[in-house]
Amino acid sequence: MAAKTVKKTRRRKERKNVEHGAAHIKSTFNNSIVTLTDAVGNALSWSSAGALGFRGSRKSTPFAAQMAAETAAKVAMEHGLKSIEVYVKGPGSGREAAIRSLQAAGLEVTLIKDVTPIPHNGCRPPKRRRV
């Protein structure tokens, strides 16, 4: 008896028609992650410097953040996204570059908000680096 081969059919992602959404930019010292969502918060597209193939110290550059924002914007604009609110989190170098890249891609930015979490004297920070 030969084993039956079951062919799995992959479901194509349906094209959502969203005009207004949000861009969440998380920019750390090591990486930049850009997620574009609809108004509710469901992700339309995402990209990061590491996912694009940047490795090591190049991952934390403004250029890497710019490329991540560009690729995420292209996919989201296929879903009909036109205007976004930008929420920026983190102390990284790619914050401004990612916002500029989203505007250059053709998305209208209606709001820019810094949502970096600030502790009310919470955890002890890591010790200073001595190089």
UniProtKB/Swiss-Prot annotation:
Keyword Cell cycle: no
GO biological process, alphabetically ordered: translation
One Pfam family this sequence matches: Ribosomal_S11
Similarity comment: family membership: Belongs to the universal ribosomal protein uS11 family.
KW RNA-binding (keyword) present: yes
GO CC terms of this entry: ribonucleoprotein complex; ribosome
Oligomeric form and interacting partners: Part of the 30S ribosomal subunit. Interacts with proteins S7 and S18. Binds to IF-3.
The protein's role, per its UniProt record: Located on the platform of the 30S subunit, it bridges several disparate RNA helices of the 16S rRNA. Forms part of the Shine-Dalgarno cleft in the 70S ribosome.
Biased composition (Basic residues): 1-15
Disordered: annotated segments: 1-23
Gene field: rpsK
Domain of life where this protein originates: Bacteria
InterPro entries on file: Ribosomal_uS11, Ribosomal_uS11_bac-type, Ribosomal_uS11_CS, Ribosomal_uS11_sf
Entry-linked PANTHER family: 40S RIBOSOMAL PROTEIN S14/30S RIBOSOMAL PROTEIN S11 (PTHR11759)
Name of the protein in question: Small ribosomal subunit protein uS11
GO molecular function per UniProt: rRNA binding; structural constituent of ribosome
Key words, A-Z: Ribonucleoprotein, Ribosomal protein, RNA-binding, rRNA-binding
SUPFAM superfamilies named in the record: Translational machinery components (SSF53137)
